[in-house]
Amino acid sequence: MQSVLVLDFGSQYTQLIARRIRELNIYSEILPYNTPADTIRTHQPKAIILSGGPNSVYDQTAFMPDPAIFSLGIPVLGICYGLQAIAKHFGGVVASSNKHEFGRSKILVEQQGDNPLFQNIPNSDVWMSHGDKVMQLPEGFRATASSDNSEICAFESTGVNSPAHIYGLQFHPEVQHTLYGKEMLGNFLLNIAAITPDWSSKSFIEHQIEEIRRKAGNNTVICGISGGVDSTVAAVLVSKAIGKQLHCVFVDNGLLRKNEAEKVMHFLKPLGLHITLADSSDLFLKRLKGVASPEKKRKIIGRTFIQVFEEQIHHEKFLVQGTLYPDVIESISVKGPSETIKSHHNVGGLPKRMKLKLIEPLRELFKDEVRAVGRELGIPEDILMRHPFPGPGLAVRVLGSLTHERLEILREADEIYIEELQASGLYSKVWQAFAVLLPVQSVGVMGDKRTYENVLALRAVESSDGMTADWAPLPHDFLARVSNRIINEVRGINRVAYDISSKPPATIEWE
């Protein structure tokens, strides 16, 4: 399978570059900006893309790629900072510009001579995000596009006193605001690099089945399954590879949505998985009694989950995890692991403690690709399009201390909210939606009597990957209907609010 390497210089758009490449049915990987050329050679890429970044190439601490990558004979495309890094390396002049360019800008494409990167692309709007610019081209390079504020918006090497097939774009072709960005990437990858677009869900599945069989051999494998998209797709893919060697465990921690355990077991049954239901709800709730701190809740739930999961491990040698590519990128990127905002509840501590070897069949995929693989595997759409649900469950949606009564209040209210979203055709239009029971009571009037009851918040967000999110502008009449139903049908709530915070600065979940 032919591939492209994206070297990460710290751009907020690096993952987007990789995703745009995959949309062209070409496999892409992200590596740190300083990956040695010898390492790159072992990957045998057909092209290299240098991402943007927040730094200036003329700073003493500027990030620069291994110079030897330009001698590999592989086409290279620099984007924004990547263009400037190429210009500096080959002797061009890069400096701070008096006129910064941020947002939309119109470029003029050079029409004289051959211009393969801009083949069949007219003058058009692009997305700029730079304060520095190339003041003077290196020897052996020519400008191929310009804007009002930048005479050099794009360039290419001529192959005379410079290597062949080195290209640069000062703007961001990966961003949707660049009207012909996908076509530019297509020109570079399909025409200039002559890559065969052979990356697809089907080819991925075929490759992973071979890898899983090779890795697992005749050993038994265990998988914690939650009913969410990632764990379900991972389990079905592994099951397709090794069949009855896979043992799945669904842990009921007492913090699930209304009838969640029964629903999950019901819709997973037709998928042919061997699943054990471990009902440990009493144990979880006993240990969480009186605990109000969200971080303490997460830690208790995490430790208890490991204990319960450990009891289900017998002779298994491997553990399946639904790790996705953004998790992998986070650990190897130029920025390194981000500051921990919340501790994450998963079974990440199990392999070291239990001496289990990992099988991570989805570690090369983004979220949308996981769903595409799920469709190829025949997993029903209503499973694939389920909204994300946090590992700690309702423990982080009932703010403050947990009680059976408060959990039941939230379950009833949340079910009404989701039911109305589905009935209105809105469920599939938002990334995630849920209710939150606040540790606040308010005065109300019901039946001419004073009430002093709980406040509930409704949350719905729009996102593509959960890394950033905007609050969803749900119709007012819809919110009024949901609020009216909850207050009338759920005993213990007399006020409903709607959360209009985006991420950042807020997180999607409240705790």
Swiss-Prot record:
The UniProt keyword set, sorted, is: ATP-binding, Glutamine amidotransferase, GMP biosynthesis, Ligase, Nucleotide-binding, Purine biosynthesis
Catalysed reaction equations from the record = XMP + L-glutamine + ATP + H2O = GMP + L-glutamate + AMP + diphosphate + 2 H(+)
What InterPro entries would the database entry show?
Class_I_gatase-like (IPR029062), GATASE (IPR017926), GMP_synth_C (IPR001674), GMP_synth_GATase (IPR004739), GMP_synthase (IPR022955), GMPS_ATP_PPase_dom (IPR025777), NAD/GMP_synthase (IPR022310), Rossmann-like_a/b/a_fold (IPR014729)
What Pfam families does this protein map onto?
GATase, GMP_synt_C, NAD_synthase
Q: In what pathway does it function?
A: Purine metabolism; GMP biosynthesis; GMP from XMP (L-Gln route): step 1/1
Q: List the disulfide bonds.
A: none
Per the UniProt entry, the Enzyme Commission number(s) are 6.3.5.2
Q: List the active-site residues.
A: 80, 172, 174
Residues that hold ATP according to the record: 226-232
Task: Give every GMPS ATP-PPase domain span.
Answer: 199-386
Q: Is ATP-binding there in the keyword field?
A: yes
Q: Which GO terms describe its cellular component?
A: cytosol
Domain of life, per lineage: Bacteria
Domain Glutamine amidotransferase type-1: from-to ranges: 3-198
The terms under GO molecular function for this entry are:
ATP binding; GMP synthase activity
Job description of the protein: Catalyzes the synthesis of GMP from XMP.
Q: How does it assemble?
A: Homodimer.
Provide the protein name: GMP synthase [glutamine-hydrolyzing]
Question: What is the scientific name of the source organism?
Answer: Chlorobium chlorochromatii (strain CaD3)
Gene name, Swiss-Prot/TrEMBL: guaA
